[in-house]
Amino acid sequence: MKKVKLSLIANERSRKTSFIKRKDGIFKKLHELSTLCGVQACALIYSPFIPVPESWPSREGAKKVASRFLEMPPTARTKKMMDQETYLMERITKAKEQLKNLAAENRELQVRRFMFDCVEGKMSQYHYDAKDLQDLQSCINLYLDQLNGRIESIKENGESLLSSVSPFPTRIGVDEIGDESFSDSPIHATTGVVDTLNATNPHVLTGDMTPFLDADATAVTASSRFFDHIPYENMNMSQNLHEPFQHLVPTNVCDFFQNQNMNQVQYQAPNNLFNQIQREFYNINLNLNLNLNSNQYLNQQQSFMNPMVEQHMNHVGGRESIPFVDGNCYNYHQLPSNQLPAVDHASTSYMPSTTGVYDPYINNNL
């Protein structure tokens, strides 16, 4: 909802419209208040737009409520009474209190930043006076009091300070570890330190592991002791991809997890995969007329088609198959081409020939 600016409406017509609208709203709210809560209320409104002041609920009802109000003692009457000046003074007092609280919060943040910068050696960047130093001292004393109170509470509860706080990491040199895994590794540590293992959980380090390591040329090619045996151990990397798959017996934990969900089914790959694909694809045109008539396609040469047919068709003794695009999803096989009777390709052509019945007509009109 748009916030209304509380100022006098300059336009007289708009001011009158707003007056009528809001007056009816006040009377409606008073009716709801007196009906729902069972209280006595009245309203008197004077306006330059109406000659006679308006009262609610009526003139008699307004007089009755006003007389009861005047019978009350002056202290009780002025306790909740407020005019415009009193209302504005109360708002100003609340605003000043909020401003004071915000100023104190900003000062606390400034002094805290000043303290941290002094710890970092940036005290020379500030222009401070005696009051700033006093505020800094108060801030430091506040933090010290909190730390001392925490220490005293721990001592009173019978707890040890070292047991409640995680121990500091103890750093030792790499040469003092004495593990065979580091001595056999192709990566040799020269200088640096590593963190010790946690006493409660030996698999977790208590701090950062920041060794300075240098590696020679053998560190790149030589296999380490833990990771390099997983993808390549006991696997024939030079096996023929067209041969049947050979499943290896797992020799370690990693090979077992790789092969435990595999079915031991061998698949015989075709000897010539591309030849089979070509035969399946180019058998679509077996029933077409390859010996096209020169009168149909004058630019078509028989010598150009023969090499393509010989290249993409299988040998004579091979098995011909009906392609999948003809609706043969089961790949039924035909008889070998050497057992099929010799059929003239011209008889299987779906194109009408220009020679034959229409020869006299063509010869007479050309």
Curated annotation (Swiss-Prot):
Residue span, MADS-box domain: 1-59
One Gene Ontology term of the molecular function aspect: cis-regulatory region sequence-specific DNA binding
Signal sequence, renumbered to the chain: none
Cell compartment(s), UniProt: Nucleus
Predominant location: nucleus
One biological process term in Gene Ontology: positive regulation of transcription by RNA polymerase II
Coiled coil: 86-115
KW Flavoprotein (keyword) present: no
Pfam families recorded: SRF-TF
Keywords tagged on the record: Coiled coil, DNA-binding, Nucleus, Transcription, Transcription regulation
Superkingdom of the source species: Eukaryota
SMART domains xref list: MADS (SM00432)
Gene Ontology cellular component terms for the protein in this record: nucleus
InterPro entries, per the entry: SRF-like_MADS-box, TF_MADSbox, TF_MADSbox_sf
Quaternary structure note: Interacts with AGL62.
Function: Probable transcription factor.
Protein name, per record: Agamous-like MADS-box protein AGL36
Species of provenance: Arabidopsis thaliana
